[in-house]
Amino acid sequence: MDLDFEDGSFDAVTISWGLRNIPDPALALREMARVVRPRGRLVILEFSTPPSRAFRSLYSVYQKTVMPTMARLASTNDGAYDYLVESIRQWPAQEEIARMVAANGWDEVEYRNLTGGIACMHRAVKPLP
């Protein structure tokens, strides 16, 4: 992955609902760090794993029953929703994503669960050289 921008071109980079769809997320994070200026920001919004076991179980039932039903009613592409559910299940939990962000060019990594952990926002800062 080579973004067609010079080093330090941007004050911030954001990605929503997309990092889990990139074949090599670690490479993408490094490339994002390259194009952001020192002390620039990273914000990731992505599906995640609810930390509560009870809520996680309830959400799993929702994914297996409600989401496919809604997909059949709202879309002509059932496979897209099958992919969505499977990609969410395979995506690492919050702490692992935070470690991946920190290991690939970012400091001050924080995250905040949204909607009980169904989604999560990770934030980070590019360190000074």
What residues fall within each predicted segment?
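Residue-level signature of catalytic and energy-coupling elements of molecular machines
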Residues: G18, V66, A124
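A short glycine-rich, Lys/Arg-flanked "PGG" loop and its adjoining helix->strand segment in the class I
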Residues: A26-R41
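Residue-level signal for the nucleotide or nucleotide-sugar donor/cofactor binding architecture
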Residues: R20-D24, R89-P92, A119
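C-terminal alpha-helical "lid/dimerization" subdomain adjacent to the S-adenosyl-L-methionine
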Residues: L45-N104, E110
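A short acidic, Gly/Pro-enriched loop at the edge of an enzyme's catalytic core
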Residues: M1-V13
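C-terminal lobe and adjacent flexible extensions of AdoMet/dcAdoMet transferase-like proteins
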Residues: R99-P129
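A short SAM/SAH-binding and catalytic strip from SAM-dependent methyltransferases
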Residues: D11-P25, S48
